[in-house]
Amino acid sequence: LVEQVNQALATPTPLRIQGANSKAFLGRVTAGEILDTRSHRGIVRYDPTELVITARCGTPLTELASVLDAAQQMLPCEPPAFGDDATVGGMIACGLSGPRRPWSGSVRDFVLGTRVITGLGKHLRFGGEVMKNVAGYDLSRLMAGSYGTLGLITEVSLKVLPKPRQALSISLQMNVEQALLRLAEWGQQPLPISAACHDGECLHLRLEGGEGSVAAAHDRLGGEVLDASY
């Protein structure tokens, strides 16, 4: 990848950084020679006891999820994947977070370190692989949502979390206005809510955590239990 960037720099030729191209509908249309990152893939380091995983940019999110699942762990931000081939690099570059965003945080919040090829062909490392990395400005998190404008992400270290022991989805009948008021109220209380959506008629909630806390929250909130695949 460094060689391709340096060749483009010498020509000069604009580059279009691309993994699975599953998020091409985002942002403006770009032109340039395609630099495909999918061959630069694989898990570099993973120690479940440290809750940190390091992967190359072309690693499919499905592969990352499978490795984490084997250790009963997961990505905290639950990023949306527009296709089975969506990559780790694309997840960071686009900075999209899933339904856990209001409760767990964004993709940016869990980036510990990155390796990046700059527009001048330099392969730099920012951040590290620990949470308490406070030396200097946290440039690694700038890469989240940068859409490749700050450089080509080649490697990223992410904080991960243990999977919840229990998950339950419920449906509560109420209009949008009521749902917004309830969510604002519940957001100030220790409820194990990890996702919410409104379909026009009902508020759907996902509860995750220990068996006791999920059962207690369900007893308090009520609602119809939804199919586990919801």
Model-flagged regions — what are they?
Residues 31-35:
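Short, well-ordered secondary-structure micro-motifs within conserved domains or adaptor modules
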Residues 21:
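Short, basic/aromatic recognition patches that contact phosphate-bearing ligands
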Residues 93, 112-230:
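C-terminal substrate-binding/cap subdomain adjacent to the FAD-binding core in PCMH-type
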Residues 24-29:
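Short glycine-biased active-site loop of nucleotidyltransferases that positions the nucleotide triphosphate
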Residues 1-17, 37-84, 92, 96-129, ...:
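N-terminal glycine-rich flavin-associated loop
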